[in-house]
């Protein structure tokens, strides 16, 4: 006969709880919704085991799995075996099974679609995978760019190593990236050619998507004759702007070790320098995702230099995400918060800011007017008017 389990603690007995005056606690415990508690535990499991998703995404980018599916044609789905056959020198007999498990994970995050079909004589099912709507951003487009490079940057060893110093930075101060590499991320670029290449490629990929949308929606480039792009990297942002506004003379301004790799672009002059020292003169100054890399003090120094470089009625066009003052659970809110914490680990005082904080910076730098103009794919285009 099976032994009836008993509690080793008499106070756990319901009747004992009542006798001890704990009836309310007992009732509260047993009133808890079991389904709700299960959902909370399942979510906790997802959090505890979330590392495989970014790692699998990185491997998918390296193997170009999404590109292989895209090459098959619109709305096509491929089995893991078909995808494995398209890999270069795929001599591993277990590759299809491994890819199937990886793609299954990506399907749970809606990166790919999945249809299970009858496996026929082999028994079981065969899963076929296609591209979900978000996947197009991780497949090279007509400009040869994707957000895959941004994944490679964030998953690269230079950035990954920074996270190991986050606890130390919280307790002792300092910037995790600096603790690992002995310098800030921007000077580190000049010492590591491979990292510099990945960084520039990631910035190029993201900028290309965003600036094309901005040029279509934002009309503030009209009547500008000389536009200075501060922190313009290799000049691709100005390439898009000047191709749409040929009358604009573009000045691509960045650190010398960045500018030396910049290609020749019609209508664009590359100028090396330091934005904390001085900025070339222009009718308007453009800055996309620059201020979020720096502390308020550094931003003020840069903005004051912008103010000096502008004529009366000139403007700084700032493109940045805007942090929401109270956390939300939307994909955009999560993306902004994730980037904010990345900046905390990698940049000298960098952070995402609220609209109110941008207005405070603009006013402190001497600008007469702060004007949020339009919202484009998660970014705000804001004008600081002199």
UniProtKB/Swiss-Prot annotation:
Q: Binding residues for S-adenosyl-L-homocysteine, per the UniProt record?
A: 207, 231, 254, 274, 288
Q: Per the UniProt annotation, how does pH influence activity?
A: Optimum pH is 7.5-8.
Question: Any idea which residues are catalytic in this one?
Answer: 292
Q: In which pathway does it act?
A: Aromatic compound metabolism; Alkaloid biosynthesis
Its Gene Ontology biological processes? methylation
* Transferase found in the keyword field: yes
Q: Where does S-adenosyl-L-methionine bind?
A: 254
Q: Which InterPro entries match?
A: COMT-like, O_MeTrfase_dom, Plant_O-MeTrfase_dimerisation, SAM-dependent_MTases_sf, WH-like_DNA-bd_sf, WH_DNA-bd_sf
Tissue specificity field: Expressed at high levels in all tissues.
Thermal response of activity: Optimum temperature is 45 degrees Celsius.
**Catalyzed reaction equations:** 4-hydroxy-3,5-dimethoxyphenethylamine + S-adenosyl-L-methionine = mescaline + S-adenosyl-L-homocysteine + H(+); dopamine + S-adenosyl-L-methionine = 4-methoxytyramine + S-adenosyl-L-homocysteine + H(+)
Q: Which GO terms describe its molecular function?
A: O-methyltransferase activity; protein dimerization activity
* Function per UniProt: O-methyltransferase participating in the biosynthesis of natural products derived from phenylethylamine, including mescaline, a natural hallucinogen potentially used in psychotherapeutic treatments. Catalyzes the O-methylation of dopamine, 4-hydroxy-3,5-dimethoxyphenethylamine, 4,5-dihydroxy-3-methoxyphenethylamine and N-methyl-4,5-dihydroxy-3-methoxyphenethylamine. Also involved in the conversion of N-methyl-4-hydroxy-3,5-dimethoxyphenethylamine to N-methylmescaline.
**Family assignment from sequence similarity:** Belongs to the class I-like SAM-binding methyltransferase superfamily. Cation-independent O-methyltransferase family.
PANTHER family listed in its UniProt record: O-METHYLTRANSFERASE
Describe, as the record does, how this protein assembles with itself and its partners: Homodimer.
Q: What is this protein called?
A: O-methyltransferase 12
Q: Which organism is it from?
A: Lophophora williamsii (Peyote)
């Amino acid at each position: 006969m099976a032994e009836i389990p008993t509690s080793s603690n008499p106070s756990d007995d319901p009747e004992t709880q009542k006798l001890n005056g704990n009836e309310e606690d007992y009732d509260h415990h047993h009133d808890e919704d079991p389904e709700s508690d299960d959902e909370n535990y399942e979510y906790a499991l997802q959090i505890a085991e979330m590392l495989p998703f970014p790692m699998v995404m990185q491997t998918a980018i390296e193997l170009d799995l999404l590109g292989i599916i895209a090459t098959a044609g619109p709305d096509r789905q491929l089995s893991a075996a078909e995808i494995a056959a398209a890999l270069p020198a795929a001599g591993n007999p277990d590759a299809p099974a491994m890819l199937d498990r990886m793609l299954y994970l990506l399907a749970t995050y809606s990166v790919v679609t999945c249809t299970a079909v009858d496996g026929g004589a082999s028994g079981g099912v065969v899963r076929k995978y296609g591209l979900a709507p978000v996947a197009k951003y991780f497949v090279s487009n007509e400009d040869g760019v994707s957000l895959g490079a941004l994944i490679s940057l964030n998953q690269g060893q230079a950035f990954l190593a920074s996270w190991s110093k986050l606890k130390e930075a919280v307790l002792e101060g300092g910037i995790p990236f600096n603790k690992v590499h002995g310098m800030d991320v921007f000077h580190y670029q000049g010492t590591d050619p491979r990292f510099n290449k990945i960084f520039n490629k990631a910035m190029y990929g993201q900028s290309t998507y965003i600036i094309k949308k901005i040029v279509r929606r934002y009309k503030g480039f009209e009547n500008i004759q000389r536009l200075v792009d501060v922190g313009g990297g290799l000049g691709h942002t100005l390439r898009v702007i000047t191709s749409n506004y040929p009358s604009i003379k573009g000045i691509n301004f960045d650190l010398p070790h960045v500018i030396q790799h910049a290609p020749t672009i019609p209508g664009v002059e590359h100028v090396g320098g330091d934005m904390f020292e001085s900025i070339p003169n222009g009718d308007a100054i453009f800055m996309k995702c620059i201020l979020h890399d720096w502390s308020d003090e550094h931003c003020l120094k840069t903005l004051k230099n912008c103010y000096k470089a502008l004529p009366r009625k000139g403007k700084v066009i700032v493109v940045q995400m805007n942090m929401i003052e109270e956390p939300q659970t939307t994909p955009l809110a999560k993306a902004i918060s994730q980037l904010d914490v990345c900046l905390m680990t990698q940049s000298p005082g960098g952070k995402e800011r609220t609209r109110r904080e941008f207005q405070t910076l603009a006013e402190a730098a001497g600008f007469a007017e702060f004007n949020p103009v339009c919202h484009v794919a998660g970014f705000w285009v804001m004008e600081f008017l002199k």
